[in-house]
């Protein structure tokens, strides 16, 4: 696959699934974090009530988890809480296919970070290392540059290995035999479901079956079971 080709999927009302989502930019999210660190103020203007900001930072539930380098001992109003590099931190991450977002800040240190990247396989790990380096620099952490060099080199090595593994997986999927009981032309058409809507199957010039379901599209491949296909 050509990784330079943009992913066709974009967030729309039809694909704003799971817990939902939002569209924003790095500058706007940075302004949002400035408000978090300034009791709702951005510059001299009170953008959000200070009482709301303080309440949103208060832990509402206890948790006992971790995401990469980030401890999660509680959950506030949309913010995970925990200690990071010896300081209290609030953070929330998110993502979509081909994209990963990172928002975090240290209220006591007055430091915040926004990282948006469009890498698919290692996006979360990449932003994790950027955060390690950025906070390390901001806090004057000894040896952070050498540590970052080592971690980024390991990530680059892992990326090459994952790329090769992805190629092997795609080749294995393409090699699966088709076990359809009818000619492929028989499966082309429109399929309607009361809850799932319409799925369109089209026989293409290369004899492959293209599947479209609303905003989603893919090319089917063979599957192990009779009269089944794989659609990803």
Task: For every predicted segment, state its role.
Residues 4-232:
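Catalytic loop of the DD-peptidase/beta-lactamase superfamily, centered on the K-T-G motif
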Residues 1:
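Extended acidic/charged loop-beta regions that coordinate divalent cations
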């Amino acid at each position: 696959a050509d990784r330079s080709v943009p992913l066709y999927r974009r967030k729309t009302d039809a694909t704003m699934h799971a817990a939902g989502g939002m569209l924003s930019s790095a500058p706007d999210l940075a302004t949002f974090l400035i408000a978090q660190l300034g009791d709702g103020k951005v510059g001299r203007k009170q953008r959000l009530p200070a009482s709301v900001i303080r309440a949103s930072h208060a832990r509402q539930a206890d948790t006992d988890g971790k995401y990469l380098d980030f401890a999660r001992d509680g959950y506030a109003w949309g913010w995970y809480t925990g200690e990071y590099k010896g300081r209290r931190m609030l953070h929330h991450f998110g993502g979509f296919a081909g994209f990963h977002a990172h928002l975090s800040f240290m209220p006591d240190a007055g430091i915040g970070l926004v990282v948006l990247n469009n890498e698919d396989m290692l996006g979360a790990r990449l932003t994790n290392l950027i955060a390690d380096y950025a906070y390390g620099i901001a806090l004057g952490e000894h040896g952070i540059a050498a540590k970052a060099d080592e971690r980024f080199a390991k990530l680059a090595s892992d990326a090459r290995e994952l790329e090769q593994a992805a190629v092997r997986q795609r080749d294995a999927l393409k090699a699966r035999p088709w076990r359809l009981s009818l000619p492929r032309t028989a499966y082309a058409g429109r399929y309607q479901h009361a809850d799932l809507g319409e799925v369109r199957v089209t026989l293409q010039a290369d004899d492959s079956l293209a599947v479209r379901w609303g905003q989603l599209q893919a090319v089917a491949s063979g599957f192990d079971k009779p009269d089944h296909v794989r659609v990803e």
